[in-house]
Amino acid sequence: GSQPMGAVGVSDKIYNAIVDNGPEHGVEFFHGYTYSGHPACVAASLATLDIYEKEDIFARAEKMSPYFLDAVFDAFKDVPAVTDIRGDGMMAAIDLAIDKTPGVRGYDAQKKTFANGVHIKFTGDCGIIAPALIAEEKHIDEMIQKIKDVVVKY
C-alpha cells in the first residue's frame, strides 16, 4: 500500500517574502488538501525513513549500481532496435527505433514486458528501467532478460 505525503521546503528568503507580503494573520502556506497533516501519512513516512537508514538502502543501491548499469549496457548494446542506452545510479533508459509511427513500438514493448512479469515505463519509444533499490543481482538479471526477450524481436 501507499500513503500520500507531501512537503513544502523553501529558503528563509522566500519564506520571509511570503510572510511579509501575505495577509495579516493569514496562513503562510495554506494547502487544505485531504491528506495535509494526515497522521498515518506522517507515521508511514517516518517508518520508511527509519528503514532506509537502518538498512542503509542508499548505500546498497550505490553498491549495486555498477552491476545494474553494466547489465543494461551489455544486454542492449547489440540489439538493432535499440538506438540509445543511458543510465545513472539505479535508473537507465533505452530508446527504441521508431517504426513508422512514434510511440507504437514503445507501447507494444510496455504491454509485452508487463505480460512477461516486468513493468518498464515507456514514454514514446523511450523505456525507463528502474529496479527496486533493494534489488539483488539475480533480480536485475531476470528483469533485464525479460525486457531483452521482448526488445530483440523488433
Describe the predicted segments one by one:
Residues 1-154:
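Conserved N-terminal phosphate-binding loop of PLP-dependent enzymes in the Aspartate aminotransferase
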